[in-house]
């Protein structure tokens, strides 16, 4: 099911920056936000509790990757924060993914990271010694995530159609690296606009700097939301 709101990546490290950004929005505007490593490691669980207290949805993007028992226990702790979505690394293997599902339970959405959108095929082959194509690697990880009963994967929008062709109906694709037309792509290698991501079948999109660093973040958010909605 397509999420109508773009997920905003809160690429901050301080509580003050985070609060100042969220305070720009009307109280009745309930957002879906991503808390990544920088903000979570700086502020800890309290930042999740604060944002949830405002009525926003929280995607906690920590990309867990460890032995199954450790991941299971960590997910059980994160479940107590009432998060709406969490991530693990698909490279941890099917048993680790199953353990993550057991720890988090069936309520929150659980998705696996396949290949980062900052990774090119040449980098994957050189750094990871994976000699298939980038798409084949992503499809392999996606099928493993589906086998482990995860809800979906993080992937580039260019890979969405192929992933949906080899996974069960309802398997979701969350797409980072979304940039409005004409914006700076930064360190992302595989990017699309919100309109392109919608047309190709992405279920969630994540947008950070084009919103958080905009002169008018609320206007930027509303414009991207409208483009995403079609």
UniProtKB/Swiss-Prot annotation:
SUPFAM superfamilies, alphabetized: Ribulose-phoshate binding barrel
Pfam families noted in UniProt: OMPdecase
GO cellular component: cytosol
Self-association and partners: Homodimer.
Residues forming the catalytic site: 63
EC number: 4.1.1.23
Keyword Magnesium on entry: no
Family designation: Belongs to the OMP decarboxylase family. Type 1 subfamily.
Recorded metabolic or biological pathway in which this protein acts: Pyrimidine metabolism; UMP biosynthesis via de novo pathway; UMP from orotate: step 2/2
Protein name: Orotidine 5'-phosphate decarboxylase
Binding residue positions for substrate: 11, 34, 61-70, 117, 179, 188, 208-209
Gene encoding the protein: pyrF
Gene Ontology MF annotations: orotidine-5'-phosphate decarboxylase activity
Xref: InterPro entries: Aldolase_TIM (IPR013785), OMPdecase (IPR014732), OMPdecase_AS (IPR018089), OMPdecase_bac (IPR047596), OMPdeCOase_dom (IPR001754), RibuloseP-bd_barrel (IPR011060)
Provenance organism: Streptococcus pyogenes serotype M5 (strain Manfredo)
GO BP: any one term: 'de novo' pyrimidine nucleobase biosynthetic process
Chain segments annotated as transmembrane: none
Catalytic activity: orotidine 5'-phosphate + H(+) = UMP + CO2
Protein purpose: Catalyzes the decarboxylation of orotidine 5'-monophosphate (OMP) to uridine 5'-monophosphate (UMP).
SMART domains: OMPdecase
UniProt KW keywords: Decarboxylase, Lyase, Pyrimidine biosynthesis
PANTHER family, per database record: OROTIDINE 5'-PHOSPHATE DECARBOXYLASE (PTHR32119:SF2)
């Amino acid at each position: 099911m397509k999420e109508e709101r773009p997920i905003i990546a809160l690429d901050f490290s301080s509580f003050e920056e985070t609060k100042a950004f969220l305070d720009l929005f009307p109280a009745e505007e309930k957002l879906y936000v991503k808390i990544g490593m920088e903000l979570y490691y700086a502020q800890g669980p309290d930042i999740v509790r604060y944002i949830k207290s405002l009525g926003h949805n929280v995607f906690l993007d920590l990309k867990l990757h460890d032995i199954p028992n450790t991941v299971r226990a960590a997910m059980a702790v994160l479940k107590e924060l009432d998060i709406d979505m969490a991530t693990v690394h698909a490279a941890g293997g099917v048993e680790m993914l199953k353990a993550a599902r057991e720890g988090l339970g069936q309520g929150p959405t659980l998705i696996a990271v396949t290949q980062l959108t900052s990774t090119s095929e040449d980098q994957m082959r050189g750094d990871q010694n994976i000699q298939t194509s980038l798409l084949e690697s992503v499809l392999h990880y996606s099928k493993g995530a589906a086998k482990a009963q995860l809800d979906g994967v993080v992937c580039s929008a260019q890979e969405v159609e192929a992933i949906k062709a080899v996974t069960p109906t309802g398997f979701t694709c969350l797409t980072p690296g979304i940039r409005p037309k004409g914006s700076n792509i930064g360190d992302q290698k595989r990017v699309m606009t919100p309109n392109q991501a919608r047309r190709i079948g992405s279920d969630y999109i994540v947008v950070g700097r084009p919103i958080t660093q905009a002169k008018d973040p609320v206007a930027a958010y509303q414009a991207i939301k409208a483009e995403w909605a079609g």
